[in-house]
């Protein structure tokens, strides 16, 4: 059997293979509520054979949405439709996961197909918050620097969102601390210029993420895993670095984090990112090698043999696929056939199974 299709157990949750649906924003919600689009989008990837389906960045507070069209989990009223999604995913033999997020200074923007520009409060947007009053790009409105009460609210919002996620049936929680959103903004000295207990030193800049992890882990049953997505580097001198990520991974491991989802960038506009096939795998490999903590590799993983090589050579424990699963929701089934592994197909689709000659 191909390494890509061996099971992986994280705490009390076993993934049937090493293919994970990476969280991908659909910008298709209204007031945070999921709808049929999200059910079909996530459900079809579960039908397609992925082991873990992680729902897109789901806002822990309304002001934490990237766009007015983001999913949310800040009120109990969001839960009934989310339960439909998790039940369907589980019925296909996959594990439902959710990425909890706060967009920080990158909140209150339009969706990509609407131009991605900021939405003013008069147009349905809202004031944004960040560690420091520094806009992501100079042309945008500067965010408000969070005070202690605001920081305490962020921590409480993540914990409350975790409780709701459990009530909705999610079995894996991922904290979004990457891509220039709030928790990443606190990590990087390029966006965090505070002089209090949350700025300056490595320990201070990582304090908020540590407190969020502790709050979420306290809410989670011991048998359920906790993931953290990190941008392993800002790709800019003076920013968050790969060395920082290794050091932070060791800290997070001690706080009960079970896997680091290794992405990069997003905190510096026009950063010189060397985008190419598997360009972020090296960061997953390094964190795994130097800490012993399981990792996930993500970013332009588009080929069955490429994914197999990543897992087989111990560079990462799982691969997270995004664009490739938009192109082919049934990539896991097709990859298994290509790699010579026989997987059960949904009985409704059995007539479409490729036959070996």
Model-based region annotation:
Residues 1-357:
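Flavin-dependent oxidoreductase catalytic cores
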């Amino acid at each position: 059997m191909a390494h890509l299709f061996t099971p992986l157990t994280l705490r009390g949750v076993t993934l049937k293979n090493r293919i994970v649906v990476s969280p991908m924003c659909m910008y298709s919600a209204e007031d945070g509520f999921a709808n049929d689009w999200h059910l079909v989008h996530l459900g079809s990837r579960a039908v397609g054979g992925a082991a873990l389906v992680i729902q897109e960045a789901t806002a822990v507070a309304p002001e934490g949405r990237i766009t007015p069209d983001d999913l949310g989990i800040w009120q109990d009223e969001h839960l009934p439709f989310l339960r439909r999604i998790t039940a369907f995913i589980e019925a296909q033999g996959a594990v439902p996961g959710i990425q909890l997020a706060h967009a920080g200074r990158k909140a209150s923007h339009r969706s990509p197909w609407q131009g991605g520009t900021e939405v003013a409060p008069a147009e349905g947007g809202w004031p944004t918050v960040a560690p420091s009053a520094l806009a992501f790009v100079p042309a945008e409105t500067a965010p408000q620097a969070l005070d202690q009460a605001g920081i305490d609210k962020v921590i409480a919002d993540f914990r409350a969102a975790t409780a709701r996620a459990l009530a909705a049936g999610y079995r894996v929680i991922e904290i979004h601390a990457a891509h220039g959103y709030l928790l990443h903004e606190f990590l990087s000295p390029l966006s965090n210029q505070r002089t209090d207990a949350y700025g300056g030193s490595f320990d201070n800049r990582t304090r908020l993420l540590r407190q969020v992890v502790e709050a979420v882990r306290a809410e989670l049953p011991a048998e359920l895993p906790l993931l953290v997505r990190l941008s392993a580097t800002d790709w800019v001198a003076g920013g968050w670095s790969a060395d920082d990520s290794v050091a932070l991974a060791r800290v997070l491991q001690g706080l009960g984090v079970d896997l680091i989802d290794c992405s990069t960038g997003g905190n510096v506009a026009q950063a010189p990112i060397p985008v190419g096939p598997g360009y972020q795998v090296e960061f997953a490999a390094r964190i795994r090698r130097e800490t012993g903590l399981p990792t996930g590799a993500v970013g332009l993983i588009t080929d069955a043999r490429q994914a197999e090589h990543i897992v087989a050579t111990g560079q990462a424990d799982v691969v997270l696929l995004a664009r490739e699963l938009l192109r082919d929701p049934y990539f896991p089934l097709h990859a298994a056939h290509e790699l010579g592994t026989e997987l059960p197909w949904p009985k409704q689709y059995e007539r479409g199974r490729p036959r070996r000659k």
